[in-house]
Amino acid sequence: MNDKYDIVVVGAGPAGSMAARAAARSGANVLLLDRRREIGVPVQCGEALSEDPLKDLGIKPDPRWIAGKTNAVKIVSPSGIAVRISEKKVVGKMGYILDRKVFDKHLAMLAAKEGADVRVGTVVDGLLMENGKIKGINAHGIEGRLEFLADVVIAADGVGSRIARWAGINTALKLVDIESGVQFQMVGIDFESSSTMEFYLGSKIAPGGYAWIFPKGEDMANVGLGVLGSRAERRPAIQYLQDFVKRTPDLQKGKIIEINAGGVPVGGPIKRTVKDNLLIIGDAARQVNALTGGGIDYAMRAGDIAGDVAAKAVAEGNVSEKRLNEYEKRWREKMERSLERYLKAKNVLISLSDEDLDELAKALSKIKFENISLTAMLKSLLKTNPKLLWKLRGLV
């Protein structure tokens, strides 16, 4: 491997691998590196993804990394009122439950096939600076100390990005802006349907967040939850999850075969994702759905844009903030409105009491699948619960 590259991408999650793939495809000399010795391990999310980003980015679904397919959602209120929504009827798309251990490796392989070098077990220790400009990274690996020069560094190093912080960008998170997530992979459990994703709401279940059951086969599922740091009452997330498993009949016979945990940023994107010689993507840029905590879709799209912009900038010999700002403009045009909408929805959701959530579930249960929409929900509430409708005004 070289020690001089056009672009170094730090972090081989979906964002980083897509950035490396796009940049290498455009002719750049790219290094993709990750601190883990095995890409995709440990898993740090529920592993749900819609088919849209795969279609849009030209990635053919592969049964090796699709653990389950979903076509419906069940939402359960604090008192047990269940609302069932058909994904196909309402949004016209299929959902997948991934095997991230295989999926993440697959994306890194796509980058490698386009010509990117890939290094695992390589920990970045700092940025190489020259006259105030980023010129590469310091790292260490099994060989010892390492230096890689680069015209552009792409930070895909996750929540609380050290790369961004070293570059002078504030990555500190308030308690209200981060969820602590924990997940069990369980076997031997019962399902209402192996194609239905289940979500459970309530302050006793997951304060400020929700619990989930995502099927991964006939009797296996990801069972997890996220709790908002400002609402957790000093209890670790795993205690809430253990309680959820104990009180949920479908899970009581199940056995835990894996535990994963991590933090999820739910406070909206950082203000700036570009500096001279630097782009910030994925969880590092907090490009995450604040309502669900899902970030794979946004990460892949942002990575693809970043890799394309970085490669073009290098080819032009101009890697200034002004030139790289094309990335900032493109990702915000494509994603910012959606991210803002979900952030508003999250803020409304955490303001609701358990009684409010029950009333909301009652209203939703009266709407036909074909008519599920924000407008239909608000019309139903106008008839049944105008007081709750006022609390939901922030959604409009």
Predicted regions and their residues:
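Beta1/beta-strand and adjacent pyrophosphate-binding region of the FAD-binding site
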Residues: 2-15
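Conserved Rossmann-like nucleotide-cofactor binding loop
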Residues: 15, 38, 160
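FAD/FMN-dependent oxidoreductases across multiple families
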Residues: 231-309, 315, 321
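C-terminal helical "tail/cap" subdomain of flavin- and related membrane-associated enzymes
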Residues: 311-396
